[in-house]
């Protein structure tokens, strides 16, 4: 009886024509979440979820594979057009955007929503290599 309640319906919604792709490119990883216009998650993927570990997660190639995976899952729901919101300073920003365009989506707008402080918290110390 408990097993019946534990079942979760997956991917029940179809035919969502347009959505928003949120690309979060940090120094350590790149996460891509594709939502509908209201912000409900349709699909997501990340470089870590694609099997990359450690410093390989922050590469542009890992971001490209993650974007292709998220795009393929979103295309199963009938998504055709995307607005892209890019956030963060990571190296996977451009490659994730190119992968979304190459997956056959019509990108209508690209926004940079990286949070920029108006002299807020003290930043972490500079790296000396």
From Swiss-Prot:
Entry-linked Pfam families: Ribosomal_S11
GO biological process, one term: translation
Keywords, sorted A to Z: Ribonucleoprotein, Ribosomal protein, RNA-binding, rRNA-binding
Signal sequence extent: none
Domain of life the protein comes from: Bacteria
Gene Ontology CC terms, in alphabetical order: ribonucleoprotein complex; ribosome
GO molecular function: rRNA binding; structural constituent of ribosome
InterPro entries: Ribosomal_uS11, Ribosomal_uS11_bac-type, Ribosomal_uS11_CS, Ribosomal_uS11_sf
UniProt-listed HAMAP family: Ribosomal_uS11 (MF_01310)
Family from the record: Belongs to the universal ribosomal protein uS11 family.
Subunit-level organization: Part of the 30S ribosomal subunit. Interacts with proteins S7 and S18. Binds to IF-3.
Function: Located on the platform of the 30S subunit, it bridges several disparate RNA helices of the 16S rRNA. Forms part of the Shine-Dalgarno cleft in the 70S ribosome.
Protein name (Swiss-Prot/TrEMBL): Small ribosomal subunit protein uS11
Gene name in the database record: rpsK
């Amino acid at each position: 009886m408990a097993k019946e309640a534990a079942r979760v319906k997956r991917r029940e919604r179809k035919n969502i024509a347009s959505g928003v792709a949120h690309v979060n490119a940090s120094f350590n990883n790149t996460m891509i979440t594709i939502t509908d216009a209201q912000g409900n998650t349709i699909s997501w993927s990340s470089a870590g979820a694609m099997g990359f570990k450690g410093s390989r997660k922050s590469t542009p190639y890992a971001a490209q594979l993650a974007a292709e995976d998220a795009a393929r899952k979103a295309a199963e729901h009938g998504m055709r057009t995307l607005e892209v919101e890019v956030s963060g300073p990571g190296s996977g920003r451009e490659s994730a955007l190119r992968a979304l365009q190459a997956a056959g989506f019509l990108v209508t707008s690209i926004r940079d929503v990286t949070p920029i402080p108006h002299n807020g918290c003290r930043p972490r110390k500079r790296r000396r290599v």
